[in-house]
């Protein structure tokens, strides 16, 4: 594993041809640079390390920063310190004069000497927008933007329209910085053959936080048939920044496609658009689900339903819970209701069920075979009895038993007490014992301390630390913990320093024994 402090994409005429576009990362802890290649992964990419083109056995060699240089090489800043931890820095235990700078370039490659771009005309700068050196391209963009010459706008628009590579993308940036990118021109560029131009024109127009009517409609149409995932990702990212009337329709269009079901970002980007408006514009978000066709979209089924239901239920306000009822009522199939209920169950896990509006209570009662844990949380006495049986049954999956312990413990801990005590005394699964201890800890009963202390020696190892915390949490139980240590049933090394601090807070009687 590594901790890269700086990463650049290599774009320089003095660098090896087969390095162009690859990533170069600075890893000061291992004292080397890492060369990596990129592979497309939907709207993003993955990397694979290829080599360490620069490495040094000198323990003070610390490459921390790199940059594509004006001459086409790569400059490397070496911090040159034996220790680079923060402790040395704020105590001024570093040498501010020892840093070094290296130049990295390919053998036999000429370094570029044409670096006075400020002396060039606008036309000359435009010719540099497809230069192999990243520094030249970016500097030309900056200078054209700073000059903001209206006469250059026409030439830049023409160049963007006729070029398809770097010259088109950098021309777009220059036109934008020079103030020459209007809505009409931006709309035309949505049909540009370079997907990065399409993505960037959407991003730049989105910086205004509201799109013109014509551009918005064009982007909406694009969202339906755009073939490049990076452009779709940018549409989703821009949709998040837009007002409800523009952001929600764009997200809805993307959610009706199946291209991005497995994309690492786009489904969540669409969800964030809905989530952003789910509080202040709840009705507009829920209105999307009045359309059964939208409900059945694979992107909606897999990535949205559970999250939206969970978000509404977690807030717990009456309007939000009414929204949960509306979703359940609109769900076209049991599978959709199950997705919604999975989110609802996660939202209420670990807390008492809030007062439910009549509409939601009605929908929950109408569910086909609702989960036992949910029925327990709804106060179903029969379900609680069934849950106690499952909790005590060692043949049932531990995960199911733990879920029911949490549900029953939030509803009626008094009825659960005897069952949990039995688990502490005989259960072998560490997760189940831990869950039982966490709920029993809420009950003020001296007998519980005796029961837990009596089994300290043979508790599952993963549950023993919880049992120790349990006994230390109350003064009346802490005596049993100290008895276990003094009798040798529990080793002193098992008592963490944090537990000792808790014991010392219980008063002199316990504190004296702790010492």
Positions of PLM-derived features:
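Beta-propeller domains with acidic blade repeats across secreted/periplasmic ectodomains
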Residues: 1-124, 135, 145
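Long, ordered, helix-rich scaffold segments
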Residues: 77, 91-99, 104-515
